[in-house]
Swiss-Prot record:
The keyword Ribosomal protein does not apply. GO terms for biological process: regulation of signal transduction. It is found in: Secreted; Nematocyst. It comes from Stichodactyla helianthus (Sun anemone). This is Delta-stichotoxin-She1a. It holds the Pfam family Toxin_4. GO terms for molecular function: sodium channel regulator activity; toxin activity. Keywords: Disulfide bond, Ion channel impairing toxin, Nematocyst, Neurotoxin, Secreted, Toxin, Voltage-gated sodium channel impairing toxin. Gene3D superfamilies: Anthopleurin-A. Disulfide bonds join C3-C43, C5-C33, C26-C44. SUPFAM superfamilies: Defensin-like. InterPro entries: Anenome_toxin, Myo_ane_neurotoxin_sf. It comes from the Eukaryota.
Length: 48
């Protein structure tokens, strides 16, 4: 599933980005979004 993190949650490494939901660890009720374009870019956003 695609995800966007430019305005949905605290940025971990870089923003804005569009990518896919990753199974990485974020706080409860949040999900990790990993960028399409670079492995090191990801962020946490609130689950919808």
């Amino acid at each position: 599933a695609a995800c966007k993190c430019d305005d949905e949650g605290p940025d971990i490494r870089t923003a804005p980005l569009t990518g896919t939901v990753d199974l990485g660890s974020c706080n409860a009720g949040w999900e990790k979004c990993a960028s399409y374009y670079t492995i090191i870019a990801d962020c946490c956003r609130k689950k919808k």
